[in-house]
C-alpha cells in the first residue's frame, strides 16, 4: 500500500505488517524484540547511573512535518531527550506513540521513522515500546507523535530553579530563535531559505560538560515560549527577579531580520537545541569555557542575572529597563 489505511490501526494483519516491516526494523533492539505489551527494563544500568529517575513526556504536532535542520521525527526524539537531560540524567529509553491520518503517504511515514531511528541511535537512546493509531481523514493533520523518555539522575546532581538566589547569572548556550524563525519562514514564505536552519539537536553531550562544574544551579531547554518563558519559570520558582541585557542576546542576522519584519521578539521564539543555564556568578567563566569547547555551545553568552526585585525585565541597548511580559499565547502555534 502507498498510503496509510484505517486497517493499519485495526490490530489485524495490515497493522502487524506495518509494525514488523517498518517500526520493528527501524527501531530494532532487544526490548522491542520481545514484543510484550510493555518494555521490561533491567534496573541495573539505571541504578549504576543515578539514584533518581528523570521521566518526561511530550507530544509533537509541528507543521510542516519537514523543515531545514529536521522533521517531526527528529524533533520527537530531541525534544523529549532534552527534557530528561536538563535534570543531569542521560536519556536511555523512549516510548513512542503515533497518531496517523488515513491517507498519509507511506513514504512520509518511512522518512519520519528513519529519522527517529537515526537520531535515537546516535544519542544512545533505545525506543523500547510504542503504539500506533489511525484515524479517519481530517481527524488529525497528517501525523502526530508522542514520546516519553527516562534516564537516571546522578546522586551528586540536584539542579533546580528553586535554588536560584540574587547574584546568580544566566547563560544561554547559543543563538536565540533559530527553530521558530525557520518554521515561520516556511509558513509565511518569507524567502529566506538557506539562511535559516532549525537548531534541533540532542543536548546530552553538551550538558555532560557541565555535570562536574560546581556552581551550576539549573538548566532548561528553551522550547515553546523561548528564553522568555524559561526566565519567567525561573523567577516564579525562586521568588526573585531576573534582568536580561538586550545587547548580550546572541541572535543571528537572519533571525533578527524576521523579527524586525514581523514585529516579533526572538526571546519568544522556540528553540530546539538551546539551554538556559543558571549558575553562581563565580562559576560563569568556567561554564562558558565548557560550553564554548563544544560545537553545540560555541555561541554561548552571559545574558542576565538574578536580582532581589521581583519581575522579569529587559535592559535595552541604551540602558533603559522595561518589564518583559509573557505573550498571552504562543506567537507560533504548532511550532513543535
From Swiss-Prot:
GO terms for biological process: protein maturation; protein-containing complex assembly. Keywords: Lyase. It comes from the Bacteria. GO terms for cellular component: ATPase complex. Signal peptide: none annotated. The keyword Lyase applies. The keyword Lyase applies. SUPFAM superfamilies: PurM C-terminal domain-like, PurM N-terminal domain-like. GO terms for molecular function: lyase activity. It catalyses: C-terminal S-carboxamide-L-cysteinyl-[HypE protein] + ATP = C-terminal S-cyanate-L-cysteinyl-[HypE protein] + ADP + phosphate + H(+). The modification S-carbamoylcysteine is found at residue 336. Modified by HypF, which adds a carboxamido group to the thiolate of the C-terminal cysteine, yielding a protein-S-carboxamide. The carboxamido group is then dehydrated by HypE itself to yield a protein-thiocyanate. The modification S-cyanocysteine is found at residue 336. Involved in the maturation of [NiFe] hydrogenases. Along with HypF, it catalyzes the synthesis of the CN ligands of the active site iron of [NiFe]-hydrogenases. HypE catalyzes the ATP-dependent dehydration of the carboxamido group attached to its C-terminal cysteine to a cyano group. The cyano group is then transferred from HypE to the HypC-HypD complex or the HybG-HypD complex. This is Carbamoyl dehydratase HypE.
Amino acid at each position: 500500500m502507498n498510503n496509510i489505511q484505517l486497517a493499519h490501526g485495526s490490530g489485524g494483519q495490515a497493522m502487524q505488517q506495518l509494525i514488523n516491516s517498518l517500526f520493528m526494523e527501524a527501531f530494532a533492539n532487544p526490548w522491542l524484540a520481545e514484543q510484550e505489551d510493555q518494555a521490561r527494563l533491567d534496573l541495573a544500568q539505571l541504578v549504576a547511573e543515578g539514584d533518581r529517575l528523570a521521566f518526561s513526556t511530550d507530544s509533537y504536532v509541528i507543521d510542516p512535518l519537514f523543515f531545514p535542520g529536521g522533521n517531526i521525527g527528529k524533533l520527537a526524539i530531541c525534544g523529549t531527550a532534552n527534557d530528561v537531560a536538563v535534570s543531569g540524567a542521560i536519556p536511555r529509553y523512549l516510548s513512542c506513540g503515533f497518531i496517523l491520518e488515513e491517507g498519509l503517504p507511506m513514504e512520509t511515514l518511512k522518512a519520519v521513522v528513519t529519522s527517529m531511528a537515526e537520531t535515537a541511535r546516535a544519542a544512545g537512546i533505545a525506543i523500547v515500546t510504542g503504539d500506533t493509531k489511525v484515524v479517519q481523514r481530517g481527524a488529525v493533520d497528517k501525523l502526530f507523535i508522542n514520546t516519553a523518555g527516562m534516564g537516571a539522575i546522578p546522586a551528586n546532581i540536584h539542579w533546580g530553579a528553586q535554588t536560584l538566589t540574587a547574584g546568580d547569572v544566566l547563560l544561554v548556550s547559543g543563538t536565540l530563535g533559530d527553530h521558530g524563525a525557520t518554521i515561520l519562514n516556511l509558513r509565511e514564505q518569507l524567502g529566506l531559505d538557506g539562511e535559516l536552519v532549525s537548531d534541533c539537536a540532542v543536548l546530552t553531550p553538551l550538558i555532560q560538560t557541565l555535570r562536574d562544574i560546581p556552581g551550576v544551579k539549573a538548566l532548561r531547554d528553551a522550547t515553546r515560549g523561548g528564553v522568555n518563558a524559561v526566565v519567567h519559570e525561573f523567577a516564579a520558582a525562586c521568588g526573585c527577579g531576573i534582568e536580561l541585557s538586550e545587547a548580550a542576546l546572541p541572535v543571528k542576522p537572519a533571525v533578527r531580520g524576521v523579527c524586525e519584519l514581523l514585529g516579533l521578539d526572538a526571546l519568544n521564539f522556540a528553540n530546539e537545541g538551546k539551554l538556559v543555564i543558571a549558575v553562581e556568578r563565580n562559576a560563569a567563566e568556567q561554564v562558558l569555557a565548557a560550553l564554548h569547547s563544544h560545537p553545540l555551545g560555541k555561541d554561548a553568552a552571559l545574558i542576565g542575572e538574578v536580582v532581589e526585585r521581583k519581575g522579569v525585565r529587559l535592559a535595552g541597548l541604551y540602558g533603559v529597563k522595561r518589564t518583559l511580559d509573557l505573550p498571552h499565547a504562543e506567537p507560533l502555534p504548532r511550532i513543535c
